[in-house]
């Protein structure tokens, strides 16, 4: 399984001849190396409904006839826009032809904000994502605070790589993320959701230096690891 980081919270997974994108915020993302018009994808996995995570989902899904796997309310909202969806919820899992997806808790918000009409649409509970294929497991925490049940994620799953937000302000910061890494018990930890905007500026190298009992890896946009 090949896993690539593409800035902010964008993660690409290639396995079993399929390509998946998690939280494809491409257009307007100053930290990504991808352009929506160049992306080919079989499935899109969404952690929650905020614009910097849903991003180019509708365009990519329609262009590629890709299924969007998302929390129930968000999946319903996107289905009304003509997107093929598979709704799930916290604690549920499903075996797809590209791998197994399970949604975990995340402590954050989830909504679609229409700036033009000044409306906010509730899009359900935010989630973390566990993805398993080729006997390897990836944990994408989504946007989240530190929470004690991360210990359960570590106890119940053999996590090979965890993508954890470190930006602070909207999510946990580096200090809390160090503890999250300990609780999740991932073999490799990759920081995400930082330096996209001034309010979430962090030094990812200082973060990985503080990690214990795991390998910290800072990935630049376009860099990958193989599990």
UniProtKB/Swiss-Prot annotation:
Keywords: Hydrolase. It comes from the Bacteria. The keyword Signal does not apply. The keyword Hydrolase applies. One of its GO terms (molecular function) is hydrolase activity. InterPro entries: Metallo-B-lactamas, RibonucZ/Hydroxyglut_hydro, UPF0173, UPF0173_UPF0282_UlaG_hydrolase. Belongs to the UPF0173 family. This is UPF0173 metal-dependent hydrolase BCQ_4418. The lineage of its organism: Bacteria, Bacillati, Bacillota, Bacilli, Bacillales.
């Amino acid at each position: 399984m090949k896993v690539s980081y593409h800035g902010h919270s964008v993660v690409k997974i290639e396995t079993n001849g399929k390509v998946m994108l998690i939280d494809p915020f491409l257009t307007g993302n100053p930290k990504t190396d991808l352009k929506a018009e160049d992306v080919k994808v079989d499935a899109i996995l969404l952690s929650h409904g905020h614009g910097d995570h849903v991003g180019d989902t509708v365009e990519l899904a329609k262009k590629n006839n890709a299924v969007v796997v998302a929390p129930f309310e968000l999946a319903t909202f996107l289905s009304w826009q003509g997107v093929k969806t598979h709704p799930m919820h916290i604690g549920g899992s499903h075996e797809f032809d590209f791998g197994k997806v399970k949604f975990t808790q995340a402590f954050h918000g989830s909504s679609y904000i229409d700036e033009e009409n000044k409306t906010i649409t509730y899009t359900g509970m935010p989630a973390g994502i566990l993805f398993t294929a080729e006997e390897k497991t990836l944990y994408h925490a989504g946007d989240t605070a530190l929470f004690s049940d991360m210990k359960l994620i570590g106890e119940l799953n053999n996590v090979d790589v965890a993508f954890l937000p470190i930006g602070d302000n909207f999510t946990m910061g580096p200090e809390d993320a160090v503890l999250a890494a300990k609780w999740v018990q991932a073999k490799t930890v990759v920081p995400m959701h930082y330096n996209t905007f001034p309010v979430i500026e962090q030094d990812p190298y200082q973060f990985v230096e503080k990690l214990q009992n795991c390998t910290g890896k800072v990935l630049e946009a376009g860099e990958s690891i193989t599990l």
